[in-house]
Amino acid sequence: MSSIIHGAGAATTTLSTFNSVDSKKLFVAPSRTNLSVRSQRYIVAGSDASKKSFGSGLRVRHSQKLIPNAVATKEADTSASTGHELLLFEALQEGLEEEMDRDPHVCVMGEDVGHYGGSYKVTKGLADKFGDLRVLDTPICENAFTGMGIGAAMTGLRPVIEGMNMGFLLLAFNQISNNCGMLHYTSGGQFTIPVVIRGPGGVGRQLGAEHSQRLESYFQSIPGIQMVACSTPYNAKGLMKAAIRSENPVILFEHVLLYNLKEKIPDEDYVCNLEEAEMVRPGEHITILTYSRMRYHVMQAAKTLVNKGYDPEVIDIRSLKPFDLHTIGNSVKKTHRVLIVEECMRTGGIGASLTAAINENFHDYLDAPVMCLSSQDVPTPYAGTLEEWTVVQPAQIVTAVEQLCQ
């Protein structure tokens, strides 16, 4: 993978790293070193095989976080190394369990997260191991238990809040926006809100309009919140662990169709950088930016494109807020063409924000307008054939690349 942060004392860069004005830093929490690991050191390893060692209590600075060659080929697939195979939901569970072992302040709350193990079994076995006080079954009231988690974070705990379905978190939007995202700023920096909000979402199981929403478009405008989307067992575990260790509130998006995806992951402790994209396939002709389930639609299309003589570069952006413009920019400067593929709605979606960011920062490097393929602006139908029609299909990706590369 493009970046691994090793060691029990690992830390991730906070959003405040990007702000040079002191007043802006109040929007997000400053980095804080865990007293129990203060004497340890950690290694940041880049895909170019370079390594940097940092002492205890030091923050990963922006220039250090971004590897010198962010669009380099991955040195080795994790499946080729020693490790163990896990399904994606099992990788999430393993990452959560490891962090609960590591830090007694980590707790879990949500509907049926206890002895039932969660609606998709991400919290299976945690209640038996850690007890009902650290794995708390809540009433069916998202606004209440989300607010409870935020309050717990203000007192020093590190709650992981599960929405049984991401669509249900609309009922907690007031807590997520006015409290989770803004309390660090509105309290004058007195409180940090190290909360992880996670749960299943996306299109693909005929769950109907209410259970198939893509809430990343709703949450991206909330100040102070980071958003990441997992797409493999490897980055699911790494992002889960990094989100729990972050001093900022993080929303982790999980796709219902990816829970049973299997991959070999390392036995050693690792976390993924919350603000770094992953180079999935290096190429020369066009940059394709995607995330979550659409990563696999893009890779399916890439096989067809290669047979047609095209060489697409595929990047899983992973960080939906903030964007890794370093990795994206390096790719744009090389290929000069950009296609964005997302499952989010077209109007006000992640693709629209990413298009704006690319045009603002890399307009002079573009040989063609940025193209974005998104889901239809319609409620998700229940019928399977209609459901698939609303999201981007590989054939559409192939056609779009052919148009952009003419």
UniProtKB/Swiss-Prot annotation:
<dbReference type="GO" id="GO:0005634">
    <property type="term" value="C:nucleus"/>
</dbReference>
<feature type="binding site">
    <location>
        <position position="244"/>
    </location>
    <ligand>
        <name>K(+)</name>
    </ligand>
</feature>
<keyword id="KW-0630">Potassium</keyword>
<feature type="transit peptide" description="Chloroplast">
    <location>
        <begin position="1"/>
        <end position="44"/>
    </location>
</feature>
<feature type="binding site">
    <location>
        <position position="195"/>
    </location>
    <ligand>
        <name>K(+)</name>
    </ligand>
</feature>
<dbReference type="InterPro" id="IPR009014">
    <property type="entry name" value="Transketo_C/PFOR_II"/>
</dbReference>
<comment type="subunit">
    <text>Tetramer of 2 alpha and 2 beta subunits.</text>
</comment>
<dbReference type="InterPro" id="IPR005475">
    <property type="entry name" value="Transketolase-like_Pyr-bd"/>
</dbReference>
<dbReference type="GO" id="GO:0009941">
    <property type="term" value="C:chloroplast envelope"/>
</dbReference>
<feature type="binding site">
    <location>
        <position position="248"/>
    </location>
    <ligand>
        <name>K(+)</name>
    </ligand>
</feature>
<dbReference type="Pfam" id="PF02779">
    <property type="entry name" value="Transket_pyr"/>
</dbReference>
<dbReference type="GO" id="GO:0006633">
    <property type="term" value="P:fatty acid biosynthetic process"/>
</dbReference>
<dbReference type="Pfam" id="PF02780">
    <property type="entry name" value="Transketolase_C"/>
</dbReference>
<feature type="binding site">
    <location>
        <position position="243"/>
    </location>
    <ligand>
        <name>K(+)</name>
    </ligand>
</feature>
<dbReference type="GO" id="GO:0004739">
    <property type="term" value="F:pyruvate dehydrogenase (acetyl-transferring) activity"/>
</dbReference>
<feature type="binding site">
    <location>
        <position position="142"/>
    </location>
    <ligand>
        <name>thiamine diphosphate</name>
    </ligand>
</feature>
<keyword id="KW-0560">Oxidoreductase</keyword>
<keyword id="KW-0786">Thiamine pyrophosphate</keyword>
<comment type="function">
    <text>The pyruvate dehydrogenase complex catalyzes the overall conversion of pyruvate to acetyl-CoA and CO(2). It contains multiple copies of three enzymatic components: pyruvate dehydrogenase (E1), dihydrolipoamide acetyltransferase (E2) and lipoamide dehydrogenase (E3).</text>
</comment>
<dbReference type="InterPro" id="IPR029061">
    <property type="entry name" value="THDP-binding"/>
</dbReference>
<dbReference type="GO" id="GO:0009570">
    <property type="term" value="C:chloroplast stroma"/>
</dbReference>
<dbReference type="GO" id="GO:0009507">
    <property type="term" value="C:chloroplast"/>
</dbReference>
<keyword id="KW-0150">Chloroplast</keyword>
<keyword id="KW-0934">Plastid</keyword>
<keyword id="KW-0809">Transit peptide</keyword>
<protein>
    <recommendedName>
        <fullName>Pyruvate dehydrogenase E1 component subunit beta-2, chloroplastic</fullName>
        <ecNumber>1.2.4.1</ecNumber>
    </recommendedName>
</protein>
<dbReference type="InterPro" id="IPR033248">
    <property type="entry name" value="Transketolase_C"/>
</dbReference>
<dbReference type="GO" id="GO:0046872">
    <property type="term" value="F:metal ion binding"/>
</dbReference>
<keyword id="KW-0670">Pyruvate</keyword>
<keyword id="KW-0479">Metal-binding</keyword>
